[in-house]
Amino acid sequence: MKNYQQLWQSLTPLYDAGEAQAIVRTVLDAEYGMTLTDIIGGKVNELSADEGKKLEEIITRLQKGEPVQYVLGQADFAGRTFHVEPGVLIPRPETAELCQWIAETQNENLKKEEAIIREEFSISPDVALEDVNLFEGKGWFKRKYLRLRFLVKMLHSYKKARHTKLASPRPRIIDLGTGSGCIAITLSLDIPNSEVVGFDISDSACNVATKNAKQLASKAIFYKFDIFDMPEKCKTDRKNHLKADIIVSNPPYICEKEKADMEKNVLDYEPDLALFVPDEDPLKFYRAIAEFASLELRSWGMLYFEINPLYEKETREMLEGFGFKDIETKEDSFGKKRMMRAVKS
């Protein structure tokens, strides 16, 4: 049986030393519950014959370039563990940053709106005293009038607060191209009282997403649907209107010409359908989603994308063409323009 150093060194033809070590540590943790202290202490050498055989099989698959997430059948995302399998895109850290941006924006806006409502609903002592002094000593009719006046003020304050359109306390969220369900499930768990629906064209993806929702106690639900059919169905049949507060998507956005710069294990194992777009039409999915969002978002609803940094300008202009406003781009932790948000007017 190979020791820890021999295990990670066997992967260096494909990965640098740091990445090879991280992969082997991930395997030892997921399969055998070993901590870094256990590994340094030589616990790898204490594996049984059956455990050692299984580890060798895992290393053999890794040596062929198969992603460790597919080998283990799981991937960590936003502090949770998701089931993944071939045919479903492996969740990326950058996508977790998109989820964090959405959840933080929603929760912050909800707090702002609640503060506005509290402020608007509070009647100042001066106003209250004015009302009391005006009708003090008056009869039953005057007291009734005072109550009515107070209620009218309250109603006006409520309408004024709700007119801010900052956030819905029970937001409806649609995730298009849901894959493993990582975005939909994360938002359903991180945004209280949210109603989340995910769509994907792949049966396999919908099945995996449903499995993850059950495993993680999420109420997100998933359906098979083609993004390119959705705008037309919304136009022709009112029954298909979903009316969301938030629509989010991490659609395919890598051009064929970019393949030369990609890792072999991604090209060989992850689904092309979830990754690539034609060189001549890099915004193919974004246009369909933007059109759908222009129909299905409520007024002041928000559309979020993970984007290709190479086409940030074109994506922004496309959204402006569909009437979106307040378009904002956000960099990921690697300093790339990876996320975009737009508001429906």
Where are these regions (language model features)?
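S-adenosylmethionine
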Residues: 190-344
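A general structural signal for well-ordered alpha-helical segments in protein cores
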Residues: 4, 24-25, 55, 68, ...
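Alpha-helical elements of Rossmann-like donor-binding domains used by nucleotide-donor carbohydrate transfer enzymes
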Residues: 6, 10, 26, 54-57, ...
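SAM-dependent Rossmann-like transferase core, predominantly class I methyltransferases
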Residues: 43, 56-131, 135-192, 196-211, ...
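Short, low-complexity, intrinsically disordered N-terminal peptides in bacterial proteins
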Residues: 1-9, 148, 234-237, 345
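A general structural signal marking secondary-structure boundaries and capping sites
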Residues: 31, 35, 43, 62, ...
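An acidic site on a long C-lobe helix of protein kinase domains
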Residues: 51, 91-94, 285
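N-terminal auxiliary segments of SAM/dcSAM-dependent transferases
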Residues: 1-77
